[in-house]
Regions:
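Non-ligating segments of multi-cofactor redox enzymes
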Residues: 1-252, 262, 272, 277-280
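Short linker/helix segments within small regulatory modules
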Residues: 254-267
Length: 280
């Protein structure tokens, strides 16, 4: 029985790996391009290993996954391969009517994938959060400012308007422009993210208030299969889970599992600090 219980905690990691392998093989066969097999196998393998190490109690397991996947996507896919994997890249390929690069990435990680793993992208693979999570305010020092969340929708609309405008004006050398937008956009994200972290004393302030990608992630995350649950019979309402949650999710009420679950990044910091093991 003990062995079964120990193995059960690795099931999500196995399912994650199998999902990415299914995507890898499907795209490889559909597009007759070995890159898709290697790309999604690498990403899925890193995420599965990172989550498995976390389940085994390894302290820096999530940071391993963040660095392995985030650095690969930022430096290799973005800088070396010159693919704009930001939200502007998604609009670009979508307007071209091409199911490539950013459109595939968004479909898998940010539009349909959240049905399984919610906003796990934000916790384990985002190259912006990869840097922000190393800043000094792991625990938010101030309450979340709910009204500022509207800014992410403004950013979302601006990114759509920018790429739409470039297409409507039929700007020349648009592919090259998208590469420079990728570099400039990431620089602005890092600058804004670091500035907000110190201003609000919260590493994840950018994720809560400005990141436009959350607009894609939140709807499907509402139905996520993977989520943190609270056994209210064990909960002593000590508040440690909320104090340690980087996203200010009120996880200690079972009623929150749908609404507030759209902000949960599955970092499981709450489960580590729960004194009665009420969270799982």
């Amino acid at each position: 029985m003990k062995n079964d219980s120990r193995l059960r905690k690795y099931v999500p990691s196995l399912l994650l790996f199998l999902l990415f392998e299914a995507v890898a093989v499907t795209l490889w066969l559909m597009k007759d391009n070995l890159f898709y097999l290697l790309n999604f196998s690498y990403i899925g393998g890193c995420l599965a290993l990172g989550t498995a190490l976390f389940a085994a109690g390894k302290r820096y397991a999530r940071h391993f996954a963040q660095l392995a996947v985030g650095s690969y996507m930022l430096l290799y896919l973005g800088v070396i391969s010159r693919e704009n994997m930001q939200i502007e890249g998604f609009w670009y390929y979508l307007f071209l009517g091409t199911f490539e690069a950013a459109t595939i990435h968004y479909a898998v990680a940010k539009i349909f994938g959240p049905l399984l793993f919610g906003r796990g992208w934000c916790g384990y693979a985002c190259w912006t959060a990869m840097v922000l999570d190393f800043l000094p305010y792991k625990r938010p020092q101030k309450p979340r400012r709910e009204k500022l969340g509207v800014l992410r929708y403004v950013m979302f609309a601006l990114s759509l308007a920018l790429v739409s405008g470039l297409f409507l004006m039929k700007v020349a050398h648009l592919e090259q422009i998208m590469f420079w937008l990728f570099l400039a956009g990431n620089a602005l994200y890092y600058l804004a993210g670091i500035a907000l972290a110190f201003a609000f004393k919260d590493n994840r302030a950018f994720c809560k208030y400005l990141c436009p990608v959350a607009v894609f992630l939140k709807p499907m995350s509402y139905f996520s299969l993977l989520r943190v649950h609270c056994d209210e019979s064990k909960c002593v309402h000590c508040g440690k889970c909320l104090r340690d949650c980087p996203m200010d999710v009120e996880v200690n009420r079972e009623a929150r599992k749908r609404k507030n679950g759209t902000e949960c990044i599955l970092c499981y910091e709450c489960t580590k600090v729960c004194p009665t093991k009420a969270l799982h």
